[in-house]
């Protein structure tokens, strides 16, 4: 029940993502793709999460770097881009293609690729807007290290079905945090 509630809450947050909160022109379809990404990820379940409890692992998600109060709008775009790129890399790997239903996986990756394209366009618009390079690089490095730990975990567990279920749950968490960041930035923009 708690997971269903979290899923529905994430969909609500994602549905209110606004391109204006990033200060760039993301198409309206970006919001729809975000909803679809969550829906597809939920549909990709192959095993009951209960059967994989013994395989759970703490990956050290850099919450303060992705959803912390100190992250600024200019920092958000590169961090969200990196997060999306890393998720796409995980799910386009050769090992991933054997773990999931091909149709769902293709749709999921296609929607992530479209989101990545929109974020890339935002990055290009942001050229010249400088955030502290050290702060931004610190956040990007934290995201990369987090996904490196996930990749190592998958390799150590020989890309087992339970390992992929654990990773899918972790990706859900990462996507939820990015949705929370977008919601917070939107609120900040509306308040100003």
Swiss-Prot record:
One of its GO terms (cellular component) is extracellular space. Glycans are attached at residue 190. Disulfide bonds join 24-122, 52-162. It is found in: Secreted. InterPro entries: 4_helix_cytokine-like_core, Interferon_alpha/beta/delta. Residues 1-23 form the signal peptide. Its main location: secreted. The keyword Glycoprotein applies. It comes from the Eukaryota. One of its GO terms (biological process) is type I interferon-mediated signaling pathway. One of its GO terms (molecular function) is cytokine activity. There appear to be at least 12 rat interferon-alpha-1 genes. Belongs to the alpha/beta interferon family. Produced by macrophages, IFN-alpha have antiviral activities. Interferon stimulates the production of two enzymes: a protein kinase and an oligoadenylate synthetase. This is Interferon alpha-1. It comes from Rattus norvegicus (Rat). The gene is Ifna1.
């Amino acid at each position: 029940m708690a997971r269903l509630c979290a899923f529905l809450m994430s969909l609500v947050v994602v549905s209110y993502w606004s391109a204006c909160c990033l200060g760039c022109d993301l198409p309206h379809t970006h919001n729809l793709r975000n909803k679809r990404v969550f829906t597809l990820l939920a549909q990709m379940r192959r095993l009951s999460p209960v059967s994989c409890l013994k395989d759970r692992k703490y990956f050290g998600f850099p919450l303060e770097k992705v959803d912390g109060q100190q992250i600024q709008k200019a920092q958000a775009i590169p961090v969200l881009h990196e997060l999306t790129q890393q998720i796409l890399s995980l799910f386009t790997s050769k090992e991933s293609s054997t773990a999931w239903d091909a149709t769902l996986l293709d749709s999921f990756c296609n929607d992530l690729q479209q989101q990545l394209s929109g974020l890339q366009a935002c990055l290009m618009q942001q050229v010249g807007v400088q955030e502290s390079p050290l702060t931004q690089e610190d956040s990007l490095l934290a995201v990369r290290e987090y996904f490196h730990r996930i990749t190592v975990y998958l390799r150590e567990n020989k890309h087992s079905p339970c390992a992929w279920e654990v990773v899918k749950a972790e990706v859900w968490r990462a996507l939820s945090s990015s949705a929370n960041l977008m919601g917070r930035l939107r609120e900040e923009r509306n308040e100003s």
